[in-house]
């Protein structure tokens, strides 16, 4: 009996030593992880503040810029003197997760609001983008033609597409401010429902909106998406 007790005691001491060592390891790991987590949270907060200072606001999982006007086909417009600069909004950028080629309109070309003027090749599919306003194309972004990935990486900045001289002042009726933000947020919700109900793809709940890559869709599914959201 005494020998059994000694064995049990020895096992207990051994297990206690292991548990103590594991506890020390966990404490050390936690001590190392907390500063890393704090740094990650701080970086995220700094990035959010920087985007806020630049005029970006969240809108249902996509980014909205306060200084722009927005058209139904998910393009933005920025007045620059007597010209209007045109680019893709963040929801269009989500639908087109990457681009391998961009065909822009020609300089001097007359464009009409609602008619396709840009063709983007993305993920094995093509998407046509409608002009937000009627007028004459007076400038093209050569950078985005050479480097189509700018449409994804900087859609509100260096990824702009072309500038147009409007034929009239009807562009002033485009959505802006809180009205535009509310519309874009509604469009983000509509896109999530569309993917789930019509195409059977579940999008992430909360946080950043993530659309299904075009390459994973059939041709008819892709046409449904572009008709419903890019209006082409």
Pin down the residues of each PLM region:
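Contiguous, well-folded functional domains in the mature portion of proteins
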Residues: 2-232
